[in-house]
């Protein structure tokens, strides 16, 4: 086999190595420089995006594994460096170009805002588990923690100390359990509080939507703060095409307030797709169900809104333990009743078709 053929096979193998943060082939990202093969030894220049790249070990391991599959290569000389500023700027410009209006009207990403009327109904826990369950089904999933004052998503997914990676003007979100995650908690010091007025909240949400590079997503879940305040209004303005999932408990007080959050979403043009009832009873050892918070709240809200009750998630110790440990119950205890209910919800949302109504198809009619 000629050296030219081996080099061609080597480039093809490296094209299968995916940057774990950007989720693109490293060859497409211009992270592979010179390649040469001499007497069975392959020489490869690898350019990381930044100094101290958190994905460096993973990328280097995957490169070595890819090279090992190439026939005719018996050894590897891997030179690891860092992109120059010009190369990094070119990469940033290229990535920004591929994500123009990444969540605009023409986007095929399904956006689901998860809302509740009041706090303490388990909205964030359900959102985190739903994101992980969708990712486990093979979907590309992003999760934005829009609960700026009460952020909890990083802890629920086991990445409380993770920080995003910056490449130029772009922010690359950490990945947890196959989900790309961004939260204001990744930019604050432990033990500090966030106390901002409306304009600052709006700019934060806007920056999450424009400067965070999620790549090509099938689904973006947004964990809203409870209530009908500034963030909900901002997201209604920025993402009028988004769908809304309403979370409540069976209790009448929670159900009444949850309905109001759905009505505000509708006023901004968003579509309420369904209701999820959390804490819907505790399964006893004898199989009976103890209704600690009453019953019927979710069904009542769904009926008044004219949407389906998509799931009824029972009280579960495993669900709480999964949130405390950062290992969502859908992964830690998939046979738990709460996990099964959340998996069924993910299946319902994953198989729901997305229409093309209102989207430009880019066709030139002559």
Where are these predicted regions, by residue range?
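Walker A/P-loop phosphate-binding motif and the immediately C-terminal alpha-helix
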Residues: 110-147, 262, 275
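Short edge beta-strands and adjacent turn/loop segments
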Residues: 20-47, 313
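Conserved catalytic-core segment of NTP-binding enzymes
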Residues: 63, 203, 211-214, 218-325
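Phosphate-binding loop that captures ATP/GTP phosphates
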Residues: 134-196, 202-209, 299
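C-terminal boundary of histidine-terminating zinc-finger modules
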Residues: 325-336
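Flexible beta-alpha connector loops of hexameric P-loop NTPases
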Residues: 54, 187-200, 246-253
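N-proximal, solvent-exposed amphipathic alpha-helical segments enriched in charged/polar residues
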Residues: 1-33
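Extreme N-terminal, non-catalytic leader segments
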Residues: 28-31, 38, 49-52, 56-116, ...
């Amino acid at each position: 086999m000629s050296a030219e053929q081996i080099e061609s096979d080597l480039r093809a193998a490296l094209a299968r190595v995916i940057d774990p943060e950007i989720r693109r082939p490293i060859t497409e990202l211009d992270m592979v420089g010179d390649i040469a093969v001499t007497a069975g030894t392959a020489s490869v220049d690898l350019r990381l995006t930044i100094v101290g790249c958190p994905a460096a070990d993973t990328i280097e391991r995957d490169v070595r594994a890819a090279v090992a599959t190439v026939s005719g290569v018996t050894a590897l000389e891997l030179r690891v460096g860092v992109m120059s500023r010009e190369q990094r700027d070119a990469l940033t410009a290229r990535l920004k170009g591929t994500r123009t209006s990444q969540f605009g009207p023409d986007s095929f990403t399904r956006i689901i805002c998860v809302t509740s009327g009041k706090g303490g109904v388990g909205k964030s826990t359900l959102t985190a588990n739903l994101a992980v369950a969708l990712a486990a089904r093979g979907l590309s999933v992003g999760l934005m923690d829009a609960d700026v004052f009460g952020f909890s998503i990083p802890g629920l997914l086991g990445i409380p100390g993770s920080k995003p990676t910056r490449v130029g003007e772009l922010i690359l979100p950490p990945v947890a359990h196959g989900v790309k995650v961004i939260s204001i908690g990744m930019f604050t010091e432990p033990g500090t509080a966030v106390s901002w007025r409306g304009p600052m909240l709006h700019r934060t949400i806007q920056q999450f939507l424009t400067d965070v590079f999620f790549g090509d997503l099938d689904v973006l879940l947004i964990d809203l703060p409870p209530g009908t305040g500034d963030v909900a209004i901002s997201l209604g303005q920025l993402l009028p095409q988004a769908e809304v999932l309403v979370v409540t408990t069976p209790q009448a007080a929670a159900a009444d307030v949850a309905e109001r959050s759905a009505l505000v979403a509708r006023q901004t043009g968003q579509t309420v797709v369904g209701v999820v009832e959390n804490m819907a009873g505790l399964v006893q050892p004898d199989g009976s169900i103890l209704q600690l918070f009453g019953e019927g709240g979710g069904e009542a809200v769904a009926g008044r809104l004219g949407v389906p009750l998509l799931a009824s998630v029972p009280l579960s110790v495993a669900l709480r333990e999964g949130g405390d440990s950062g290992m969502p119950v859908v992964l830690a205890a998939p046979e738990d009743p709460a996990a099964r209910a959340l998996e069924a919800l993910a299946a319902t949302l994953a198989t729901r078709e997305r229409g093309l109504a209102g989207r430009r198809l880019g066709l030139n009619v002559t």
